[in-house]
Amino acid sequence: MGDAMDFDDSAALLEQVNRALENATPLRIQGANSKAFLGRIVGGEILDTRAHRGIVSYDPTELVITARCGTPLVELLAVLDASQQMLACEPPAFADDATVGGMVATGLSGPRRPWSGSVRDFVLGTRIITGHGKHLRFGGEVMKNVAGYDLSRLMAGSYGSLGVITEVSLKVLPKPRACLSLSLEMPSEQALLRLAEWGQQPLPISAACHDGRQLHLRLEGGEGSVAAAHDRLGGEPLNSSFWADLNEQHLGFFDEDQPLWRLSVPLNTPPLNLPGEQWLDWGGAQRWLKSTAEAAIIRKVVGDVGGHATCYNHGLIDEPFHPLAPALLHYHRQLKRQLDPRGIFNPGRLYAEL
């Protein structure tokens, strides 16, 4: 895009990977390190992606943007905002210098996720340095091109364990014309029932969170539909900054006085019988739990309803991610061996076996 900060550092990244392959040196891939608290502790030589940055291409009419992995997420969002467009999955940054590569590698999505999709759903194509020492392109840069989608999307949420993402093409969407946030007093049990009921109706809900006392809603869409939904649902006005604070974990609930767990459960799961304080997010499909209960107890309760639990405190437990079933772990190990046969990329970040 011609910015003075644009720089293609892919040759240096490829050289470092090939040197690591020759010497069997594990690599710890990182950008701004803003999400280092997620996953297992990783050793190895640091591969820093931040110098490889810049918007490669952006066509607002095609709803596609392509950026290098070290591009600060805030810069990409500013470019989109100038054209009244957005990343609909609302990825959290957790730091001002968080990178696009880290956004894709962790695959984290914000409050809009159940209504718009995840980071993975918006990945159209990638360029990746593989464990074979090759710099390859997968997928496309237009929405109609489906070649290579699966491999590109596998990078989302892989935590750098399958390769070095050097470039990514993302689908973007127009910003909604109207947005209104509301709060309604009700217990969590009633909130889940109401959300299940509203989910069957054409309401422009784009975020829903219950903080143990109030149900917070965000309405987005055309001015008429948002106004009509407000008239129907009622509620008191809520500052729209609530959603960014929730997404970035700036609210008091997220203060680190107790271990923090992210619980992913089926949408209509009743309140979980676990010690500690819980918030409902994603309309109930994501629960935030602050609890000193043992990991095995939390995962047993969550697993019994078909969900999984991730610990958000770095180094607190040996396995922060929910254990995989044997068949699924076998599949993950096969995939790792195919893409990273020497096992140099973020070894053990997700699981000890990977």
Regions found by a protein language model. Give the residues of each.
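Short, conserved charged micro-motifs
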Residues: 74-76, 189-194, 223-231, 268-275, ...
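N-terminal accessory segments
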Residues: 1-34, 302-326
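Short amphipathic beta-strand starts and helix->beta connectors
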Residues: 49-52, 164-169, 198-207, 271-277, ...
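Short beta-strand
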Residues: 28-29, 206-211, 278-282, 311
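N-terminal glycine-rich flavin-associated loop
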Residues: 2-29, 49-96, 108-141, 176-186
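Conserved glycine-rich FAD pyrophosphate-binding loop
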Residues: 40-42, 95, 236-354
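C-terminal substrate-binding/cap subdomain adjacent to the FAD-binding core in PCMH-type
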Residues: 105, 124-259
